[in-house]
Amino acid sequence: MAEMRPGPVVGKQLNEQPDHSPLVQPGLAELRRRAQEEGVPETPQPLTDAFLLRFLRARDFDLDLAWRLMKNYYKWRAECPELSADLHPRSILGLLKAGYHGVLRSRDPTGSRVLIYRISYWDPKVFTAYDVFRVSLITSELIVQEVETQRNGVKAIFDLEGWQISHAFQITPSVAKKIAAVVTDSFPLKVRGIHLINEPVIFHAVFSMIKPFLTEKIKGRIHLHGNNYKSSLLQHFPDILPLEYGGNESSMEDICQEWTNFIMKSEDYLSSISETIQ
């Protein structure tokens, strides 16, 4: 009988390998070669193994897809300096202190990080859509350093209670396109789910503006829970939701404060990657 030999380690199997594994080296070497050949800038972030692995893991080690994602990341940053060149958290500290955003302490059953955004804590007279988007980008740049998050991605909960016309006016077609670009194929994080709760009728006009820019895969991961959301939301996130959303975890106030503290402790790192890419 012929000896059974294991097949090559590919895709999701490679995703489970640690950064220093010899099995990931060929992919790293090829992605680095392409980046250097194309003249990808080594500032503000050098082409270290850890940095390159973000793109490889985000696309399950498909080199062509990882390379496309990497090019899109640099293209987006070059085209949106108003966001990418200003990741200093003090510019959005008021929004954070208001309780707009937090990251849950525990991951969901699939290992995804879970982010919560609360629209009622965004005062559109004080903060623009770009400020709100910057909060998300800052969090993304911090959690993408986590290997488990690179492997298992993120899920976001948007509590749209309090959404008003003044919020809607902030989301222009240009802003909608930039948001969609990051969600789909311009940032090295797997978006595993987008959950909307308390969505009012007037929000659907904005949603219709963003939707054409999204891929079919992302569209299929959007869940509209409405006002009676607690039972359906708990099915997706059992045991990890804060008290306000039907769970047994801490209050949103505590969760938001903890994440704000973490962002402020990361100020030096965020400043170091705040740079306009030519």
From Swiss-Prot:
Binding site for (+)-alpha-tocopherol: F187
InterPro entries in alphabetical order: CRAL-TRIO_dom (IPR001251), CRAL-TRIO_dom_sf (IPR036865), CRAL/TRIO_N_dom (IPR011074), CRAL/TRIO_N_dom_sf (IPR036273)
Subcellular localization(s) per the UniProt record: Cytoplasm
Keyword Transferase: no
SUPFAM superfamilies: CRAL/TRIO domain, CRAL/TRIO N-terminal domain
Residues binding a 1,2-diacyl-sn-glycero-3-phospho-(1D-myo-inositol-3,4-bisphosphate), per UniProt: D185, K190, V191, R192, K217, R221
Region (Disordered): 1-22
Expression tissues: Liver.
Any one GO biological process: placenta development
Positions of the CRAL-TRIO domain: 88-253
Predominant place of localization: cytoplasm
Protein name, UniProt field: Alpha-tocopherol transfer protein
Native source species: Rattus norvegicus (Rat)
Lineage: Eukaryota, Metazoa, Chordata, Craniata, Vertebrata
